[in-house]
Every structure is written in structure tokens, then in C-alpha cells.
């Protein structure tokens, strides 16, 4: 039969006044006593760290007084072992003089009560149960009473006959004795039945104590698991708080980026609207120029027709030339007019004809200028569709608008200043974007530290 360490008796040694409570300062001594009585200890019950933490706790709470159950709970939390189910070393137990507990460990008070009930039961039963040799349940048989058949034959009752004893009284006493014996037998059967019931109840009590003990152990196990789950939940809560803070930082960064994108889109939209307005104005101007060109072409055609008619008219009615006058010849107009030629008119022409020729030449020059202007607009439209926003066009426009100094030294200084400003702008934009995006080459630089404010989680 297994024997276990009497934990309650060890605790009771530190309670001389039998108050049921001991000081917390005796906890480590109790643990050492239990460790000394253990069977085949592989390692001490408390390691250095647990013992140091227990000493610190006892030092801070030296005035605390705890009960035996609280001592057991503290022992279970520190060691993870049930103090009532530790096997005992019999040799060490004899040396210390503490009685072991057998079978399954039970509370000491319940075991003593059960033993007292059993002792009382068997002690009472020894007096109630009748002896086999005596039908009257008495240690000394009543030999003075005999049956009716033995009355006359027994010599021991001769003095009764001589004294004229009453036979009826003897018969009544005998009947009363038999009645009491029957009652005693019935009571004996009742006592046996009660003994059986009591034994059954004791077995049920033992099983209930076993179930209570297992429930207590299971409750301690669940309490330990609950403490571990509570500790894990605290760690998860701290991690969740950290993730929430990082999420808020990411949200703030996203909001700032959205504002920046919105500002860029707004600026781009403004530029697009401006370009659309300029393109619409250019289209309107081009349409107006085309309309004016068509009108001028119609006028030119009409003038050419009139010119042809006038040429034929002058050819028919032209006067004979003088002898000293140069022959009839065609002369070109001095101002540019690639469309037609006006014939030579002699000096005898009228004033109206000279005015008409001057107006015709003016119209021709205006038509030529309008055509040149239309060609320039067509070339400008073709270039604007391809390289209006190209860097070369922007630079050429910028340099065309900037008035550069004539001196060579001033030009060199000006271009050097532009180069330095461009290098600074490129450095700022490049490393600013690289810092936000956290490109790996930044970690190679000695003066650059890792920034984890916007790191993804």
C-alpha cells in the first residue's frame, strides 16, 4: 500500500497553539521538510530563482498568517505538485518521527471522524450481538431456570417443592424471557442491516471523498491553466496595443499622402484646364484665320477675274505707242506678290487705273502675309501635339525668355549657379523618396539610421 508524506502533520508542527494557521515565514522550512521526506528526489522542489522570489515575497509580507489550505495552494503554484500525493521515504520518516498516511490522501479531520465512527460502531455491536452459547444474550447462562419437563426431574429444585413455590410464576418468567430473546434477535437483525447500510454509506463516503479530491486537483489544474491564459491574454493585449498604434501611424501617413496626391491632382487639373483653354483659344484663332483666309481667297479669285477682264479690256483699247517710247512689256510689282503680274500701263493711263492697281497690289501682299501666318499656326499645332510638354521644348522656351548676359564670365557663373541648384534639388527629392520608401541602399550609408515609424506590420 502506498504511503504519502503527512503534509498536514508537518504544517501542524509549526502551529504549537493549534490555531489552524501558521506564519508565512515558516513556508520555506515546510518545503525543506517535505523535500527531505520525498522518495527518490531527482531535483529540489524549488530552484534558486523560485526560492529567491519566495524569500523576497516573505520578506515584504512577513506579518501574514495563512491556513493549511493556503499553504497547500502556494506549494502547488510554486512546485506544480500536489502536496497530498507525494510518496514518502520510510527511512527518513522513521528518523524524523512523523507518521505516514496510507492509501489515498484525505483530510486528517475526516479520517479521524471516520475511524471514530467505525470504532463506536464495532464497540456497540459487541454488546448488542448475542452470544452463540446463550439464547438470552448474556455472558452468564441462567441455569436456575428450566423447562416444564425438567421441573420435576431436576434435583436442584427440590427445595422449591418443599417450600411450595408457584409454578405459574415460573412459567410466566420463562415466557417473558423467550419474548425478550425474540426481541433481541429481531434487534440483532436490525443492527446487522444497519451495519450493512453503514458500511455502504462509508464506501459512498470514501468514493465521494475520492471524487472531491479529484475535483480539487482538477480545479487546481484549471486554475493554473486559467492563470497561463490570463498571462497570454495580457501579452496579446500589449501586442494588440502596439499594432493599433502602428496602424494609427500608418493611417496618419496615408492621410498625408492622400492630401499630397490630392494637391498634385488639383494642380494637374488646373494645368490641364489651362491647356484646354489655350487649345480652345488656338482653335478659335485658327478657325478665324481659316475663315479670313477663305474670304481673302475669294477676294483674290474675284480680283484675278477682274484683273483678267481689265487686261483684256486694256489690250483691246490700248493706244499706239510713240516712236521714242519703249515697247509694250509686262512689269512685275516691286512688293512681293507671287500670284499674278500686272501689265505695264503707259503714262497716258488715268488716275483711277493707278489707284486700282495700287489697291490690287496691297490686297495681294495682305493675302501673302495671311498665308504665311496660317503656315506658322499649322506648324505650331503639329509641334504642340507631340513635344509641347517635352523637356527640350520647356528648356528652349525658358532660355528664350531668359535674357543671358553678354559677358562670358557672367554666363559661366550663371550656368554654375543653375547646376548647383539642380544638384541640391535632385539630392533632396531622391533621398526624401528613398527615405519614405526605405530603399535598401540607405542602410549602407554610415550616417543613415533605419526609420521604422512607417514600417508595415
Curated annotation (Swiss-Prot):
InterPro entries: SYNE4
Key words, A-Z: Cell cycle, Cell division, Cytoplasm, Cytoskeleton, Meiosis, Phosphoprotein
Main location: cytoplasm
Cellular component GO terms held in the UniProt record: cytoplasm; half bridge of mitotic spindle pole body; meiotic nuclear membrane microtubule tethering complex; mitotic spindle pole body; nucleus; old mitotic spindle pole body
UniProt keyword Signal, yes or no: no
GO biological process: cell division; meiotic cell cycle; mitotic spindle pole body duplication; mitotic spindle pole body insertion into the nuclear envelope
Keyword Cell cycle: yes
GO MF annotation list: spindle pole body-nuclear membrane anchor activity
Quaternary organization: Interacts with sad1.
Name of the featured protein: Karyogamy meiotic segregation protein 2
Gene from which this protein is expressed: kms2
